[in-house]
Amino acid sequence: MANFLFEFEKPLVELENKISDLKKFAEEKNIDVSRELELLSAKAQQLAKEIYQNLTPWQRVLLARHPERPNTRDYINYLCDDFIELKGDRRFGDDPAMIGGIGIIENIPVTIVGNLKGKDTKENIMRNFGMAHPEGYRKAIRLFKQAEKFGRPVLTFIDTPGAFCGIGAEERGQFQAIAEAIATLISLKTPVLAVITGEGGSGGALALAAGDKLLMLENAVFSVIAPESFAAILWKDSSRAQEASELLKLTSEHLLEFGLIDGIIPEPLGGAHRNPAETLKAVKEEVVKNLQILKETPVEELLRRRYQRYRYIGSGIVEGGVS
Protein backbone atom coordinates (compact mmCIF):
# COMPACT_ATOMS: atom_id res chain seq x y z
CA MET A 1 0.00 0.00 0.00
CA ALA A 2 1.27 3.47 -0.86
CA ASN A 3 2.73 5.63 1.91
CA PHE A 4 2.35 8.85 -0.07
CA LEU A 5 -1.22 10.06 -0.54
CA PHE A 6 -2.96 12.67 -2.61
CA GLU A 7 -6.04 14.38 -1.21
CA PHE A 8 -8.44 12.60 -3.55
CA GLU A 9 -7.09 9.20 -2.41
CA LYS A 10 -7.57 9.76 1.33
CA PRO A 11 -11.20 8.53 1.69
CA LEU A 12 -10.25 5.20 0.13
CA VAL A 13 -7.10 4.76 2.19
CA GLU A 14 -8.96 5.61 5.40
CA LEU A 15 -11.49 2.89 4.57
CA GLU A 16 -8.73 0.40 3.75
CA ASN A 17 -7.04 1.19 7.07
CA LYS A 18 -10.34 0.59 8.84
CA ILE A 19 -10.59 -2.84 7.17
CA SER A 20 -7.02 -3.65 8.18
CA ASP A 21 -7.65 -2.61 11.79
CA LEU A 22 -10.82 -4.68 11.93
CA LYS A 23 -8.98 -7.77 10.65
CA LYS A 24 -6.28 -7.31 13.27
CA PHE A 25 -8.84 -6.83 16.05
CA ALA A 26 -10.76 -9.96 14.98
CA GLU A 27 -7.58 -12.05 15.01
CA GLU A 28 -6.56 -10.77 18.44
CA LYS A 29 -10.01 -11.36 19.99
CA ASN A 30 -10.72 -14.52 17.98
CA ILE A 31 -14.13 -13.30 16.79
CA ASP A 32 -15.90 -13.68 13.45
CA VAL A 33 -16.34 -10.41 11.55
CA SER A 34 -16.34 -11.95 8.08
CA ARG A 35 -19.70 -10.40 7.17
CA GLU A 36 -18.57 -6.92 8.21
CA LEU A 37 -15.29 -7.35 6.33
CA GLU A 38 -17.14 -8.48 3.21
CA LEU A 39 -19.36 -5.39 3.28
CA LEU A 40 -16.46 -3.01 3.91
CA SER A 41 -14.35 -4.63 1.17
CA ALA A 42 -17.19 -4.26 -1.32
CA LYS A 43 -17.58 -0.63 -0.29
CA ALA A 44 -13.83 -0.04 -0.73
CA GLN A 45 -13.87 -1.64 -4.19
CA GLN A 46 -16.78 0.54 -5.25
CA LEU A 47 -15.12 3.67 -3.87
CA ALA A 48 -11.88 2.83 -5.70
CA LYS A 49 -13.79 2.56 -8.98
CA GLU A 50 -15.55 5.86 -8.37
CA ILE A 51 -12.25 7.60 -7.69
CA TYR A 52 -9.90 6.08 -10.24
CA GLN A 53 -12.25 5.54 -13.17
CA ASN A 54 -13.19 9.23 -13.18
CA LEU A 55 -9.82 10.91 -12.83
CA THR A 56 -9.35 14.46 -14.10
CA PRO A 57 -6.29 15.30 -16.23
CA TRP A 58 -4.73 17.04 -13.23
CA GLN A 59 -5.21 13.97 -11.06
CA ARG A 60 -3.48 11.91 -13.74
CA VAL A 61 -0.59 14.38 -13.65
CA LEU A 62 -0.35 13.80 -9.90
CA LEU A 63 -0.43 10.01 -10.34
CA ALA A 64 2.24 10.22 -13.07
CA ARG A 65 4.46 12.02 -10.55
CA HIS A 66 3.72 9.67 -7.65
CA PRO A 67 7.05 8.93 -5.91
CA GLU A 68 6.14 5.26 -5.44
CA ARG A 69 5.49 4.47 -9.10
CA PRO A 70 7.98 1.94 -10.51
CA ASN A 71 10.99 3.72 -11.99
CA THR A 72 13.16 2.75 -14.94
CA ARG A 73 15.48 0.66 -12.77
CA ASP A 74 12.46 -1.36 -11.57
CA TYR A 75 11.41 -2.05 -15.16
CA ILE A 76 14.94 -3.07 -16.14
CA ASN A 77 15.25 -5.42 -13.18
CA TYR A 78 11.90 -7.06 -13.96
CA LEU A 79 12.21 -7.27 -17.74
CA CYS A 80 15.83 -8.33 -18.05
CA ASP A 81 17.36 -11.72 -17.33
CA ASP A 82 20.69 -9.89 -17.36
CA PHE A 83 21.67 -6.21 -17.65
CA ILE A 84 25.02 -4.48 -18.03
CA GLU A 85 24.94 -0.73 -17.38
CA LEU A 86 27.11 1.45 -19.61
CA LYS A 87 28.10 4.92 -18.44
CA GLY A 88 29.48 8.15 -19.86
CA ASP A 89 29.14 10.13 -23.08
CA ARG A 90 32.90 9.94 -23.90
CA ARG A 91 32.94 13.76 -24.05
CA PHE A 92 32.14 15.22 -20.62
CA GLY A 93 31.04 12.60 -18.12
CA ASP A 94 28.21 10.43 -16.89
CA ASP A 95 24.71 11.58 -15.96
CA PRO A 96 22.90 9.68 -13.17
CA ALA A 97 19.58 11.07 -14.44
CA MET A 98 19.89 8.82 -17.51
CA ILE A 99 20.47 5.08 -17.27
CA GLY A 100 21.54 2.96 -20.21
CA GLY A 101 23.00 -0.40 -21.07
CA ILE A 102 22.49 -3.80 -22.65
CA GLY A 103 19.86 -6.22 -21.40
CA ILE A 104 18.47 -9.63 -22.32
CA ILE A 105 14.67 -9.78 -22.52
CA GLU A 106 13.22 -13.21 -23.34
CA ASN A 107 16.50 -14.14 -25.10
CA ILE A 108 16.44 -10.89 -27.09
CA PRO A 109 19.55 -8.65 -26.66
CA VAL A 110 18.25 -5.09 -26.28
CA THR A 111 19.82 -1.68 -25.72
CA ILE A 112 17.86 0.05 -22.97
CA VAL A 113 17.96 3.78 -22.22
CA GLY A 114 15.75 5.68 -19.82
CA ASN A 115 15.27 8.62 -17.50
CA LEU A 116 15.86 7.59 -13.91
CA LYS A 117 14.26 9.24 -10.88
CA GLY A 118 15.23 8.39 -7.32
CA LYS A 119 13.29 6.42 -4.73
CA ASP A 120 13.79 8.99 -1.97
CA THR A 121 14.89 12.60 -1.55
CA LYS A 122 18.59 11.79 -1.33
CA GLU A 123 18.58 9.68 -4.49
CA ASN A 124 16.36 12.18 -6.31
CA ILE A 125 18.87 14.93 -5.62
CA MET A 126 21.67 12.68 -6.89
CA ARG A 127 19.67 11.88 -10.03
CA ASN A 128 18.46 15.47 -10.45
CA PHE A 129 14.83 14.28 -10.24
CA GLY A 130 15.18 12.56 -13.61
CA MET A 131 16.11 15.77 -15.46
CA ALA A 132 19.03 14.89 -17.72
CA HIS A 133 21.98 17.09 -18.66
CA PRO A 134 23.51 17.17 -22.18
CA GLU A 135 25.89 14.36 -21.22
CA GLY A 136 22.86 12.21 -20.42
CA TYR A 137 21.43 12.68 -23.89
CA ARG A 138 24.85 12.22 -25.49
CA LYS A 139 25.24 8.97 -23.55
CA ALA A 140 21.89 7.94 -24.99
CA ILE A 141 23.04 8.84 -28.51
CA ARG A 142 26.21 6.79 -28.04
CA LEU A 143 24.15 3.77 -26.99
CA PHE A 144 21.66 4.25 -29.85
CA LYS A 145 24.50 4.15 -32.37
CA GLN A 146 26.08 1.17 -30.66
CA ALA A 147 22.74 -0.66 -30.87
CA GLU A 148 22.58 0.06 -34.59
CA LYS A 149 26.14 -1.21 -35.10
CA PHE A 150 25.37 -4.55 -33.43
CA GLY A 151 21.80 -4.91 -34.69
CA ARG A 152 20.12 -4.66 -31.28
CA PRO A 153 16.62 -3.18 -30.88
CA VAL A 154 16.39 -0.05 -28.73
CA LEU A 155 13.96 0.18 -25.81
CA THR A 156 13.50 3.52 -24.05
CA PHE A 157 11.68 4.36 -20.82
CA ILE A 158 10.50 7.93 -20.41
CA ASP A 159 9.79 9.52 -17.03
CA THR A 160 11.04 13.08 -16.69
CA PRO A 161 9.67 16.55 -15.93
CA GLY A 162 11.93 17.69 -18.78
CA ALA A 163 15.58 18.23 -19.64
CA PHE A 164 17.57 20.18 -17.04
CA CYS A 165 17.62 23.88 -17.90
CA GLY A 166 20.50 25.09 -15.71
CA ILE A 167 23.22 27.42 -16.99
CA GLY A 168 25.83 24.66 -17.16
CA ALA A 169 23.51 22.45 -19.20
CA GLU A 170 22.85 25.27 -21.66
CA GLU A 171 26.56 26.06 -21.91
CA ARG A 172 27.27 22.41 -22.74
CA GLY A 173 24.69 22.43 -25.55
CA GLN A 174 21.46 21.03 -24.10
CA PHE A 175 19.37 22.01 -27.12
CA GLN A 176 21.88 20.48 -29.53
CA ALA A 177 22.05 17.22 -27.57
CA ILE A 178 18.26 16.85 -27.56
CA ALA A 179 17.99 17.66 -31.26
CA GLU A 180 20.72 15.15 -32.10
CA ALA A 181 19.05 12.46 -29.99
CA ILE A 182 15.76 12.94 -31.87
CA ALA A 183 17.51 12.93 -35.25
CA THR A 184 19.50 9.82 -34.34
CA LEU A 185 16.43 7.85 -33.29
CA ILE A 186 14.46 8.81 -36.38
CA SER A 187 17.24 7.62 -38.71
CA LEU A 188 18.41 4.62 -36.66
CA LYS A 189 18.68 1.40 -38.68
CA THR A 190 17.29 -0.83 -35.93
CA PRO A 191 13.87 -1.16 -34.23
CA VAL A 192 13.00 1.47 -31.60
CA LEU A 193 10.28 0.98 -28.97
CA ALA A 194 9.51 3.75 -26.46
CA VAL A 195 7.38 3.57 -23.30
CA ILE A 196 6.23 6.58 -21.27
CA THR A 197 5.91 5.30 -17.72
CA GLY A 198 5.25 8.53 -15.80
CA GLU A 199 5.97 12.11 -16.80
CA GLY A 200 6.70 12.83 -20.45
CA GLY A 201 7.92 16.39 -20.20
CA SER A 202 8.72 18.45 -23.29
CA GLY A 203 11.88 17.95 -25.37
CA GLY A 204 13.53 16.06 -22.55
CA ALA A 205 10.99 13.28 -23.13
CA LEU A 206 10.82 13.63 -26.90
CA ALA A 207 14.55 12.91 -27.13
CA LEU A 208 13.78 9.29 -26.16
CA ALA A 209 10.35 9.01 -27.80
CA ALA A 210 11.00 9.28 -31.54
CA GLY A 211 10.80 5.59 -32.40
CA ASP A 212 8.75 3.06 -34.34
CA LYS A 213 6.17 2.62 -31.59
CA LEU A 214 5.31 4.79 -28.61
CA LEU A 215 3.33 3.30 -25.73
CA MET A 216 2.04 5.00 -22.58
CA LEU A 217 0.99 3.71 -19.22
CA GLU A 218 -2.64 4.56 -18.52
CA ASN A 219 -1.88 7.30 -15.99
CA ALA A 220 1.25 8.65 -17.67
CA VAL A 221 1.24 12.11 -19.28
CA PHE A 222 3.03 13.58 -22.30
CA SER A 223 3.06 17.31 -23.03
CA VAL A 224 5.12 20.18 -24.40
CA ILE A 225 5.21 21.86 -21.00
CA ALA A 226 4.27 21.20 -17.38
CA PRO A 227 0.79 22.50 -16.42
CA GLU A 228 2.30 24.80 -13.76
CA SER A 229 4.66 26.37 -16.31
CA PHE A 230 1.86 26.67 -18.88
CA ALA A 231 -0.30 28.52 -16.34
CA ALA A 232 2.58 30.75 -15.22
CA ILE A 233 3.38 31.79 -18.80
CA LEU A 234 -0.18 32.15 -20.11
CA TRP A 235 -1.93 33.58 -17.05
CA LYS A 236 0.98 34.61 -14.80
CA ASP A 237 -0.54 32.29 -12.20
CA SER A 238 0.91 28.82 -11.64
CA SER A 239 -1.95 27.99 -9.25
CA ARG A 240 -4.15 27.50 -12.33
CA ALA A 241 -2.25 24.31 -13.21
CA GLN A 242 -5.40 22.21 -12.94
CA GLU A 243 -7.09 24.34 -15.61
CA ALA A 244 -3.96 24.20 -17.75
CA SER A 245 -3.87 20.41 -17.61
CA GLU A 246 -7.36 20.33 -19.16
CA LEU A 247 -6.20 22.44 -22.11
CA LEU A 248 -2.93 20.59 -22.72
CA LYS A 249 -4.66 17.30 -23.67
CA LEU A 250 -1.81 15.40 -22.06
CA THR A 251 -3.47 12.13 -21.02
CA SER A 252 -2.93 8.79 -22.72
CA GLU A 253 -6.54 8.76 -23.95
CA HIS A 254 -6.17 12.15 -25.64
CA LEU A 255 -2.86 11.24 -27.25
CA LEU A 256 -4.17 7.92 -28.57
CA GLU A 257 -7.19 9.72 -30.03
CA PHE A 258 -4.86 12.18 -31.77
CA GLY A 259 -2.74 9.35 -33.17
CA LEU A 260 0.37 10.54 -31.35
CA ILE A 261 0.89 7.25 -29.49
CA ASP A 262 0.34 3.64 -30.55
CA GLY A 263 -1.15 2.09 -27.45
CA ILE A 264 -2.07 2.38 -23.78
CA ILE A 265 -0.82 -0.09 -21.17
CA PRO A 266 -3.56 -0.48 -18.53
CA GLU A 267 -2.63 0.15 -14.91
CA PRO A 268 -4.09 -1.62 -11.87
CA LEU A 269 -7.08 0.11 -10.32
CA GLY A 270 -5.62 2.96 -8.30
CA GLY A 271 -2.49 3.37 -10.38
CA ALA A 272 0.91 1.75 -10.76
CA HIS A 273 2.01 2.72 -7.25
CA ARG A 274 -0.78 0.69 -5.63
CA ASN A 275 0.21 -2.54 -7.38
CA PRO A 276 3.73 -2.32 -8.84
CA ALA A 277 3.96 -6.08 -9.49
CA GLU A 278 0.91 -6.07 -11.76
CA THR A 279 2.20 -2.97 -13.55
CA LEU A 280 5.61 -4.51 -14.21
CA LYS A 281 3.96 -7.65 -15.58
CA ALA A 282 1.71 -5.65 -17.93
CA VAL A 283 4.63 -3.60 -19.24
CA LYS A 284 6.74 -6.70 -19.87
CA GLU A 285 3.95 -8.35 -21.86
CA GLU A 286 3.57 -5.30 -24.11
CA VAL A 287 7.30 -4.78 -24.51
CA VAL A 288 7.98 -8.40 -25.48
CA LYS A 289 5.04 -8.47 -27.90
CA ASN A 290 6.04 -5.24 -29.64
CA LEU A 291 9.75 -6.06 -29.76
CA GLN A 292 8.98 -9.33 -31.53
CA ILE A 293 6.77 -7.54 -34.07
CA LEU A 294 9.39 -4.87 -34.75
CA LYS A 295 12.23 -7.40 -35.02
CA GLU A 296 10.31 -9.26 -37.73
CA THR A 297 9.88 -6.08 -39.79
CA PRO A 298 12.61 -5.32 -42.38
CA VAL A 299 14.74 -2.31 -41.43
CA GLU A 300 13.94 -0.58 -44.72
CA GLU A 301 10.23 -0.81 -43.92
CA LEU A 302 10.81 0.50 -40.39
CA LEU A 303 12.66 3.51 -41.76
CA ARG A 304 9.96 4.18 -44.37
CA ARG A 305 7.18 4.02 -41.77
CA ARG A 306 9.17 6.09 -39.30
CA TYR A 307 9.75 8.81 -41.87
CA GLN A 308 6.06 8.92 -42.75
CA ARG A 309 5.12 8.93 -39.07
CA TYR A 310 7.18 11.97 -38.16
CA ARG A 311 6.80 13.77 -41.47
CA TYR A 312 3.05 13.98 -41.00
CA ILE A 313 2.67 13.65 -37.23
CA GLY A 314 -0.13 15.85 -35.91
CA SER A 315 -1.32 16.84 -39.38
CA GLY A 316 -4.75 15.29 -38.74
CA ILE A 317 -5.33 17.21 -35.52
CA VAL A 318 -7.67 20.17 -35.83
CA GLU A 319 -9.36 22.37 -33.26
CA GLY A 320 -11.87 20.30 -31.33
CA GLY A 321 -10.52 16.88 -32.25
CA VAL A 322 -9.07 14.78 -35.04
CA SER A 323 -9.97 15.37 -38.66
Curated annotation (Swiss-Prot):
Its main location: cytoplasm. The keyword Manganese does not apply. Pfam families: ACCA. Pathway: Lipid metabolism; malonyl-CoA biosynthesis; malonyl-CoA from acetyl-CoA: step 1/1. Keywords: ATP-binding, Cytoplasm, Fatty acid biosynthesis, Fatty acid metabolism, Lipid biosynthesis, Lipid metabolism, Nucleotide-binding, Transferase. GO terms for molecular function: acetyl-CoA carboxylase activity; ATP binding; carboxyl- or carbamoyltransferase activity. It comes from the Bacteria. It catalyses: N(6)-carboxybiotinyl-L-lysyl-[protein] + acetyl-CoA = N(6)-biotinyl-L-lysyl-[protein] + malonyl-CoA. GO terms for biological process: fatty acid biosynthetic process; malonyl-CoA biosynthetic process. Residues 36-293 form the CoA carboxyltransferase C-terminal domain. HAMAP family: AcetylCoA_CT_alpha (MF_00823). Acetyl-CoA carboxylase is a heterohexamer composed of biotin carboxyl carrier protein (AccB), biotin carboxylase (AccC) and two subunits each of ACCase subunit alpha (AccA) and ACCase subunit beta (AccD). Component of the acetyl coenzyme A carboxylase (ACC) complex. First, biotin carboxylase catalyzes the carboxylation of biotin on its carrier protein (BCCP) and then the CO(2) group is transferred by the carboxyltransferase to acetyl-CoA to form malonyl-CoA. NCBIfam families: accA, AccA_sub, PRK05724.1. This is Acetyl-coenzyme A carboxylase carboxyl transferase subunit alpha. It comes from Carboxydothermus hydrogenoformans (strain ATCC BAA-161 / DSM 6008 / Z-2901). The lineage of its organism: Bacteria, Bacillati, Bacillota, Clostridia, Thermoanaerobacterales. The gene is accA.
